[in-house]
């Protein structure tokens, strides 16, 4: 954290912690009613953290309401956030994309009826998020695509929704020309091993390409889940020796890894924005990205700042990778133009400035409302 920021941790049961997710807590771990609620909701196969965290946050802020001018909720959207709003503390929320999209994709790609049922149970908290989002006066999102999806899925009035792009530190995510490129190296980031991220499609494409080019291999920033489709595919396609998962490394190492790659891939079925895409572009690595969700508006024109493929199409993805590996001049040009696009459009400084503008706009609108109502 910056020296000017302090962190208040809100203890929880941490029921999803590794290596024992969905554990049964000891009785001595239950300290209050929110711990009981967290365990009870999780026992019903529903993701409890948005509700439990928001209620704990409301309790903490009720004790310290005079310490803060505004509360910025980062897509928790639990009932506790609504309580904070109703207490009189100004609340602004960021919704990167509606989690209802994740729910649809996860249930669509579930392989059995039981898995579809459990996915629907897990994502049932999205109904709460819709109710809370509809009550908040000002919401930020990160792309035009997310804007449209939030309006459609959450039923939010467009005049309460505003776009502020997220960014990347282009002075940190930089090309490293002194680092040698490894022939055939592809790189991707899987922030979560879920259907929406499209890793399974990339693995199938990799297997296709390797029948012709045995040098092709994949580096994944992230961890596979032990029971995921991707984990099963790696074994079924005999890719164990041709894929490497790396996690828990600093940004400096990620930049170095990008510099060794011939291509970066974002195979997602949907993205509300995609930080991995602009991080790769900022490093000057030529990017292949699907047209899922907001990716086309983020990465720019096909063949200019990135290369596009349709989402969920293994053959198209394999063909694009195969073709791009044989186009050294195009890769260099796309990599250079991609970095220029990021520098021109996506900086954290700009994100911060625009976010602060919305803080003031929210405070001003509330002051006007209170003045009109005769309150202070």
Per-segment meaning from a language model:
Residues 145, 167:
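Carbohydrate-associated surface elements
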Residues 59-62, 99, 116-139:
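Membrane-proximal helix-turn-helix segments that form the acceptor-binding/catalytic region
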């Amino acid at each position: 954290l910056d020296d000017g920021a302090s962190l208040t941790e809100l203890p929880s049961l941490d029921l999803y912690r590794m290596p024992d997710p969905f554990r049964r807590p000891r009785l001595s771990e239950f300290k209050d009613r929110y711990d009981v609620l967290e365990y009870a909701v999780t026992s019903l196969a529903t993701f409890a953290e948005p509700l439990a965290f928001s209620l704990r946050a409301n309790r903490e802020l009720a004790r310290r309401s005079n310490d803060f001018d505004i509360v910025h909720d980062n897509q928790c959207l639990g009932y506790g956030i609504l309580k904070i709003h109703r207490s009189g503390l100004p609340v602004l929320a960021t919704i990167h994309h509606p989690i209802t999209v994740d729910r649809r994709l996860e249930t669509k790609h579930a392989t059995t009826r039981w898995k579809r049922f459990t996915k629907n149970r897990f994502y049932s908290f999205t109904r709460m998020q819709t109710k809370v989002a509809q009550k908040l006066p000002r919401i930020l999102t990160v792309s035009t695509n997310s804007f449209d999806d939030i309006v459609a899925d959450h039923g939010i009035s467009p005049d309460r929704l505003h776009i502020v792009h997220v960014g990347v530190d282009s002075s940190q995510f930089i090309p490293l020309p002194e680092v040698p490129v490894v022939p055939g190296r592809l790189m991707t980031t899987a922030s979560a091993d879920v259907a929406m991220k499209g890793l399974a499609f990339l693995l199938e494409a990799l297997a296709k390409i390797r029948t012709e080019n045995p040098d092709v291999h994949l580096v994944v920033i992230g961890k596979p889940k032990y029971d995921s489709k991707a984990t099963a595919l790696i074994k079924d396609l005999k890719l164990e020796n041709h894929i490497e998962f790396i996690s828990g490394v600093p940004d400096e190492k990620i930049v170095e890894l990008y510099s060794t790659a011939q291509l970066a891939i974002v195979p997602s079925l949907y993205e509300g924005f995609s930080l991995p895409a602009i991080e790769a572009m900022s490093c000057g690595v030529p990017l292949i990205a699907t047209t899922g969700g907001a990716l086309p508006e983020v990465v720019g024109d096909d063949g200019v700042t990135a290369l596009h493929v349709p989402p969920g199409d293994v053959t198209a993805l394999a063909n694009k990778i195969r073709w791009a590996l044989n186009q050294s001049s195009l890769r260099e040009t796309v990599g250079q133009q991609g970095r220029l696009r990021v520098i021109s459009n996506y900086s954290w400084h700009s994100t911060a400035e625009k976010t602060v503008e919305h803080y003031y706009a929210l405070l001003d609108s509330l002051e006007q409302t209170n003045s009109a109502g005769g309150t202070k």
